[in-house]
């Protein structure tokens, strides 16, 4: 059973610190961005999953987050909230980005994601990266002034339940990790 409410129990067992991280990132976006565009994306690597992928030192997902942050000229810890993990068996990343709605509409965020992933993969043009990224869910606007804000927050927690699964049995350190920037107080 689930110790923290709103997570999809069908995906249990959960790791409590990962549950806290999912909630922390969404609460931070709500607190610091006033009106946040939340998007879940899938980023694929254009080569096969092999031993070279498992033993490499570069974590492409973190390179993507750093590149997105640089391209949007983000103020550290304020303009971008995110979650990131890698699939344990496939060369792909699952990412949640929360950006300020006032700065990024849907098409602008599309371009930002494509530019960043293209840059990380070393492609000459963003169009080359298009087959290797896709939006998994429609954008959700999380606005603290909205009367349905609490319901939207609960829906997002449920939708991102798979990020909080217990990964202790996963061998690859990158796939075992749930990275994010919840900005815990203290």
Task: Pin down the residues of each PLM region.
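Signature for HUH/AEP ssDNA processing cores
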Residues: 24-87
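Short, solvent-exposed polar/charged micro-motifs at secondary-structure junctions
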Residues: 51-52, 92-93, 138-139
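Short, well-structured alpha-helical interface segments that form or flank functional binding sites
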Residues: 59, 63, 88-94, 108, ...
């Amino acid at each position: 059973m689930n110790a923290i409410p709103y997570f999809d129990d069908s995906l249990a067992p959960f790791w409590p610190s990962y549950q806290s991280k999912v909630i922390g990132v969404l609460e931070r976006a709500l607190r610091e961005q006033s009106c946040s565009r939340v998007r879940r994306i899938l980023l694929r690597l254009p080569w096969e999953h092999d031993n070279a992928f498992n033993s490499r030192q570069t974590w492409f997902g973190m390179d993507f987050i750093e590149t997105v942050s640089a391209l949007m000229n983000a103020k550290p810890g304020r303009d971008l909230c995110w979650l990131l993990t890698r699939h344990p068996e496939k060369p792909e990343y699952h990412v949640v980005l929360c950006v300020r709605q006032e700065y990024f509409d849907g098409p602008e965020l599309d371009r930002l994601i494509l530019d960043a992933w293209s840059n990380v993969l070393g492609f000459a043009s963003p169009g080359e990266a298009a087959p290797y990224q896709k939006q998994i869910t429609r954008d959700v606007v999380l606005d603290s002034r909205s009367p349905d804000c609490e319901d939207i927050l609960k829906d997002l927690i449920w939708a991102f339940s798979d990020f909080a699964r217990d990964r202790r049995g996963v061998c690859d350190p990158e796939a075992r990790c749930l990275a994010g920037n919840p900005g815990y107080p203290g």
